[in-house]
Amino acid sequence: MSLHLVIIDALNLIRRVHSAQPDPNDITRTAETTTRTLQRIINEAQPSHMIAVFDHHLSDRGWRAELLPTYKANRKPMPDVLQQGIDAIQDAWWQLGIDSLLSEGDEADDLVATLACKVAAHQEKVTIISTDKGYCQLLSPTLQIRDYFQQRWLDEPFIAQEFGVTPAQLTDYWGLTGVSSSQIPGVAGIGPKAAKEILNQFSSIEEAYASPELPAKYRKKLDPHIEMARICKQVSALKTDIELGFNLQDIRFNSSSAD
């Protein structure tokens, strides 16, 4: 069997399932629903290796908030009842044969990105299960992102249609436009249309900033805010060099556990 690593963005999945439950206090039902969801994902993906990555609920906003104090400053905390039920959900997933990785100081996104890129760099297949478009900056011939809830692939054609740039330009795009859901401001006065025009003409923020060909209407917006653009790009970029402390053999998926 060829290697296929499936990485679950755990809280991304759990929060969406939990928010759709008729009784938010019924964590048993949330656990059962997420387990059925994972069973369907397993049946579709046929993974050889699988892991669920969790943000540690006590972790702060990390290095990104040090660079950009507004980063996720207004994000709603996890509901207490759900936070208290995470262990039960992890236990249910363990019964399926899926181990959990909890972040300790790093955001789950960076752990997912590091693991995915390490495996994809060896030309092995990786699927990230998440609705988070931030992972699309990682896209490669062997690394794909699946939005399970919309039943769609967040692939290059999707990125081209959604943003009008390439996956490699996404962090530059967000450096210009910002990301409202994470309180990343971007450059004042540069929205999606302007960012697309700039990045269709230039490969990056730095190339645009250095070029005498940058149109004056964008120059007057970018020049006073170039440092903010750089910070927003850096905050939008996922880290791929975290020490993980385990190897692939540790997360080999035993399909008999999911039967």
From Swiss-Prot:
K(+) binds at residues 176, 185, 187, 190. Its EC number is 3.1.-.-. Mg(2+) binds at residue 109. Disulfide bonds: none annotated. Keywords: DNA-binding, Endonuclease, Hydrolase, Magnesium, Metal-binding, Nuclease, Potassium. One of its GO terms (molecular function) is magnesium ion binding. PANTHER family: 5'-3' EXONUCLEASE FAMILY PROTEIN, FLAP ENDONUCLEASE XNI. Has flap endonuclease activity. During DNA replication, flap endonucleases cleave the 5'-overhanging flap structure that is generated by displacement synthesis when DNA polymerase encounters the 5'-end of a downstream Okazaki fragment. This is Flap endonuclease Xni. It comes from Vibrio cholerae serotype O1 (strain ATCC 39315 / El Tor Inaba N16961).
